[in-house]
Amino acid sequence: MFNNCDSRTNGEYAFFMNIRDKIDCIFDVGCRSDSEFVNFAGEVHYFDPVSQFIEELKKNKNVNRSAHFNNFGLGEENKQTYYFPMYQSFYDRTNSCRISDDANKILLDIKTGKDYIINNDIKNIDFLKIDTEGYELNVIKGFEDYIKNIKIIQFEYGGTFLDNKTKLIDVINYLEQKGFHRFSYLTSNGTEIITDFSDHYQYCNIVCVNKTCILSPY
């Protein structure tokens, strides 16, 4: 369950395979160049602030009915902020990794999920996957009340939360207030409901479901 970054064996791929025929629109935030969703037959919106990742992803074989490649990150506000290439993160991971990448930092673009939804007239998002190396809560907050139009959310948790100074319960409480429940770890054997939200900083993926969602992903 913890500290397995291989999506094929840590439960991520199995979870997606379980829901893919029940969903139509995906937001892949922090897609890099190796998104699993290029093989999804529906609509996918890809987001990554690193232009190299987006350009490489565009070259991959893609069966999406509609693919939207966005060379910016998502966050709480529209701005430029420093990105640390060694960590592929908007946080310099000096707390969890003890080594600074400040000498290599670059300014990259961030926009809000709310503005993207409004500007592109998006009515519903079935699956929001967030892999942003510590920027998860920033991404989530950027949707504001439009997050209620999302059915399923998956986000990473781990050592990056030492760097962003966020507690897991902060994310849980925010999403609960927005109508999400059934917070669960993805594991190689399926999902496991979380009963203890104390911080352990072990790498894992967490999923939750909007209470208004009629499909049962797990």
Go through each PLM region and give its residues.
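Phosphate/nucleotide-binding beta-alpha loop and adjacent structural elements of enzyme active sites
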Residues: 1-218
